[in-house]
C-alpha cells in the first residue's frame, strides 16, 4: 500500500499526463464529409507543432475523399524546404466510425469530433506513443470565410484538451494559405 501511494505521489509530482480525446462524433457518415475544406483554425498541445510556417503539424487540409474500402484520403498542403508541397494521407477506418488510424506526420490517429457536413468539421490528430505524446486539432470550413459558429464549437471542444497554442485565420489568410 505504501508503494502504491508513493507511486501515485511521484506520478502526480512529475506531471505524468496522458492526452486522451474522449469526445468523438457518433454515427459519422464518411460519404458526407467528401469534398473541399479550408483550415479555419488550429490548436496543439505543444507550441512547436504549429509555431512556424514549416512546423510539423501546420498543415492545410484541402480535400477529404472517402475510399471504396471506407478509409479516408486526406489531401493537404504543407510548407517544406521553403515551398508549398501537396501531401496525401490515407486514414484507415477502425471499428469506431469517427476514428481513423494513420502513419503520417508522426501521428497515429485522426479523430472526428464534430461536423454538420455542410459548413464545418472539427478533428484532431493524436500521437499516443511515449514519450512524444501530442495532439493537434483543426476546425475546417467548406468556404474560405470566417464561421463564428464553427469557431465557437471548436473552442468548446478544446476546453477539455491540453492545448497550448491556437491559430485562427481571417478570410484573406484563408485564401493565401499554402497552395501548390
Swiss-Prot record:
Organism listed in the record: Ovis aries
Record key words, sorted: Disulfide bond, Milk protein, Retinol-binding, Secreted, Signal, Transport
Alphabetical list of InterPro entries matching this protein: Blactoglobulin (IPR002447), Calycin (IPR012674), Lipocalin (IPR002345), Lipocalin_CS (IPR022272), Lipocln_cytosolic_FA-bd_dom (IPR000566)
GO CC terms, sorted: extracellular region
Pfam families: Lipocalin (PF00061)
Post-translational modification: Alternate disulfide bonds occur in equal amounts.
Name of the protein in question: Beta-lactoglobulin-1/B
Covalent S-S links between cysteines: 84-178, 124-137, 124-139
The keyword Transport belongs to this UniProt entry's keyword annotation: yes
Cellular localisation: Secreted
Signal peptide location: 1-18
Domain of life: Eukaryota
Main location, first listed in the record: secreted
Similarity-based family: Belongs to the calycin superfamily. Lipocalin family.
Alphabetized SUPFAM superfamilies for the sequence: Lipocalins
UniProt function note: Lactoglobulin is the primary component of whey, it binds retinol and is probably involved in the transport of that molecule.
Subunit note: Under physiological conditions beta-lactoglobulin exists as an equilibrium mixture of monomeric and dimeric forms.
Amino acid at each position: 500500500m505504501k508503494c502504491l501511494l508513493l507511486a501515485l505521489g511521484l506520478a502526480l509530482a512529475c506531471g505524468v499526463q496522458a492526452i486522451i480525446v474522449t469526445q468523438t462524433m457518433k454515427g459519422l457518415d464518411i460519404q458526407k464529409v467528401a469534398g473541399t475544406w479550408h483550415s479555419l483554425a488550429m490548436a496543439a498541445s505543444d507550441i512547436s507543432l504549429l509555431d512556424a510556417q514549416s512546423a510539423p503539424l501546420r498543415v492545410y487540409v484541402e480535400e477529404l475523399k472517402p475510399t471504396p474500402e471506407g478509409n479516408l484520403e486526406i489531401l493537404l498542403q504543407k510548407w517544406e524546404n521553403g515551398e508549398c508541397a501537396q501531401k496525401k494521407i490515407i486514414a484507415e477506418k477502425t471499428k469506431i466510425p469517427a476514428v481513423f488510424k494513420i502513419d503520417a506526420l508522426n501521428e497515429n490517429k485522426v479523430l472526428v469530433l464534430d461536423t454538420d457536413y455542410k459548413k464545418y468539421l472539427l478533428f484532431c490528430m493524436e500521437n499516443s506513443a511515449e514519450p512524444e505524446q501530442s495532439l493537434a486539432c483543426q476546425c475546417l470550413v467548406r468556404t474560405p470565410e470566417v464561421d463564428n459558429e464553427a469557431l465557437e464549437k471548436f473552442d468548446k471542444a478544446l476546453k477539455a484538451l491540453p492545448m497550448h497554442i491556437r491559430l485562427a485565420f481571417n478570410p484573406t489568410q484563408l485564401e493565401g494559405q499554402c497552395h501548390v
